[in-house]
C-alpha cells in the first residue's frame, strides 16, 4: 500500500470541498427564495433560529456517533459517500416549495427541509475534515490537504457568488438552477469517495487489532479550553459565517436598491475581492 497521499487524492480532496461549498453558497440565497414564495421575513428568521438550535444539538451527537460506529470500509469514507446523495437531495428540497400551499405548510416545509439540509451538511463537513488524520500521519501532508481544501472552497465561493445570479436568470427559475448546480456539485464530490485511502486506520488495525482510544465530551471541552490555537481554528468558521451575510443579502440589495438582480454578481464581487486580499495578507 502507498504510504503517501497521491496527487489524485489531493485533487479529489479539493474538488470535494469545491462541491460542498457550492452547496453552502446556494444556502446563502435560501432567504431570498423563501420570501419569493411568500414566507415573511419574520417567519424566515424563526425557521433559521429553529434550525440553528438543531445544528447546535446535532453536531456533537454526530461526532459521538462517528466515534462509536465502525464500518469495514473505513472510518470517514462511508459517511462521505452517504453525503454525496444526502446533500444534493436536501438542497433541492429547500428550493422546490409548492407556491400553492398555505403559508403554514410552507413554513413547515421550509423548517423540516432546512433541518434535513443542516443534518446532511454535518454528514459531509465533519468527515471531510476528519479524514485528513486517517489519510496520512505526515503533518506536512495534512497541512497540504487542508490548504488545498481551503483554496478550492474559496474558489467555490467566488464562482457561486458571481455566477449563480446569472445562471438563475438564464435558466429562468430557482428550482431548475438549484437542480443543475446540485448535480454538478455532487459530481465534484464523487472522486474523493472513489480515490481516497484511509491508510492510518488500516495500519492501526494491522498493528493492534483495531483497538481505538475513546474520548469523552468532557475531554474534548478541556482540550478546547486549554488550546488557544484550537480556539482560533474554531473561531474561523464563525467569522466566515458573518462574512457570508453579504452574500445572503446581496440579491436583496441588487433587487431593491440597485435596480435589478443582474447587479447581484457585482455585489458579490464587492464582498469577495476584499476577502481574497485579506487572505493573501494573512498568509504573509
Predicted regions and their residues:
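Membrane-embedded alpha-helical bundles of multi-pass transporters/translocases
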Residues: 2-284
Amino acid at each position: 500500500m502507498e504510504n503517501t497521499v497521491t496527487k489524485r487524492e489531493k485533487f479529489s480532496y479539493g474538488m470535494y470541498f469545491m462541491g460542498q461549498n457550492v452547496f453552502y453558497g446556494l444556502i446563502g440565497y435560501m432567504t431570498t427564495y423563501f420570501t419569493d414564495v411568500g414566507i415573511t421575513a419574520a417567519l424566515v428568521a424563526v425557521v433559521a433560529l429553529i434550525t440553528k438550535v438543531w445544528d447546535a444539538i446535532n453536531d456533537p451527537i454526530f461526532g459521538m456517533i462517528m466515534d462509536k460506529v465502525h464500518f469495514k470500509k473505513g472510518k470517514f469514507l462511508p459517511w462521505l459517500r452517504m453525503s454525496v446523495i444526502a446533500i444534493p437531495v436536501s438542497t433541492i428540497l429547500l428550493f422546490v416549495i409548492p407556491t400553492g400551499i398555505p403559508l403554514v405548510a410552507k413554513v413547515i416545509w421550509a423548517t423540516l427541509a432546512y433541518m434535513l439540509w443542516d443534518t446532511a451538511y454535518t454528514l459531509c463537513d465533519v468527515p471531510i475534515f476528519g479524514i485528513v488524520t486517517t489519510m496520512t500521519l505526515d503533518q506536512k501532508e495534512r497541512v497540504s490537504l487542508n490548504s488545498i481544501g481551503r483554496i478550492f472552497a474559496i474558489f467555490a465561493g467566488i464562482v457561486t457568488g458571481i455566477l449563480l445570479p446569472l445562471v438563475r436568470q438564464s435558466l429562468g427559475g430557482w428550482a431548475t438552477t438549484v437542480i443543475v448546480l446540485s448535480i454538478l456539485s455532487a459530481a465534484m464530490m464523487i472522486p474523493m469517495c472513489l480515490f481516497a485511502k484511509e491508510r492510518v486506520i488500516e495500519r492501526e488495525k494491522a498493528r493492534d487489532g483495531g483497538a481505538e482510544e475513546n474520548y469523552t465530551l468532557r475531554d474534548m471541552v478541556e482540550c478546547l479550553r486549554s488550546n488557544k490555537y484550537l480556539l482560533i481554528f474554531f473561531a474561523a468558521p464563525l467569522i466566515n459565517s458573518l462574512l457570508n451575510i453579504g452574500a445572503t443579502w446581496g440579491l436583496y440589495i441588487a433587487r431593491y436598491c440597485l435596480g435589478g438582480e443582474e447587479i447581484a454578481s457585482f455585489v458579490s464581487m464587492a464582498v469577495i475581492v476584499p476577502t481574497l486580499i485579506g487572505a493573501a495578507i494573512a498568509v504573509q
